[in-house]
Amino acid sequence: MKTDINRRDFLKRAGSAALAMGGVAAVAGCKGGETSASAGTEEKAGGGEMTYRTNNGNGDKVSILGYGCMRWPMIKDENGKDIIDQETTDRLIDYAIEHGVNYFDTAPVYLQGQSEAATGRSLKRYPRDSYFIATKLSNFSNASLENSIEMYRNSLRNLQTDYIDYYLLHSLSGLEAFNSRFGESGIMDFLQKEREAGRIRNLGFSFHGSPEGFDELMALHEKYHWDFVQIQLNYVDWTHASGRNANAKYLQEELDKRGIQSVIMGPLLGGRLSKVPQH
């Protein structure tokens, strides 16, 4: 197996998935290609290759490109089971870090539950203060308080860390989804206490839904003080989101009104907006 990875190999593995190396634009506000006032200041790395945005809440310097960890390369084990190729994953993360990426986004449900552990093993080789981890409370099948707390604690174990930089309520569409998975169980009280204790550095949610659903969640900001929100934003979704989904322009403007910074998912629309040339 190759012991190094070049830019073309990296883009073929990562860029085509549109969740790796460009799947998350971290802590950024965007308006038609311009940086919004809520996005914080920008600065270049020493080599000028990566731009960083400042988290206005705590001063984190976050790379404008993050690494989505939903599509790590897979191989078969001796029993024919699909498992993450840890060696290649390590090399991909090494390449990303070498080129200034410091934000890594995963979730308990990614890759049949394998993503967090593989990501944690790779990142453990680096100083903890040199990168930011984002993961999610993906309590879709069992939203009980006990299960939600265990999922959160299991994320800490899998990621081999004692705190999470950016923690998201996974895939909210509005108040009904929020109440059924988070509002009624008491988990929000627990998560707020974890934030106060520093084990969650930033608390927010990822969103897929209508403008009305987003308005409902924005109405909760005074109570829960969202530190950030993850939205899908690209040049198609900016004003032509599919179905009943809210346009990204509307979502970003509503966040800007409240001074909430955004993290971007799907800037390449699952790879459909980008092709890696063969030459």
Residue ranges and their predicted role:
Residues K2-Y131, F190:
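N-terminal binding-site loop/beta-alpha segment at the start of enzyme catalytic domains
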Residues Y52, I93, E116, G120, ...:
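Generic structural signal for well-ordered alpha-helices
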Residues V62-G66, Y103, S130-A134, Y163-Y166, ...:
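Structural preference for beta-strand elements that scaffold enzyme active sites
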Residues D82-Y95, S144-N158, E212-A219:
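Short, acidic/polar
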Residues K124-Y131, L159-Q160, R195-I200, K223-H225:
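Short helix-capping segments at alpha-helix termini
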Residues Y126-L145, I149, H170-S171:
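Structural motif corresponding to the early beta-alpha repeats
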Residues L159-A177:
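Active-site groove signature of glycoside hydrolases
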Residues L172-H279:
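Beta/alpha (TIM)-barrel catalytic core signal, keyed to glycine-rich beta->alpha loops juxtaposed to Asp/Glu
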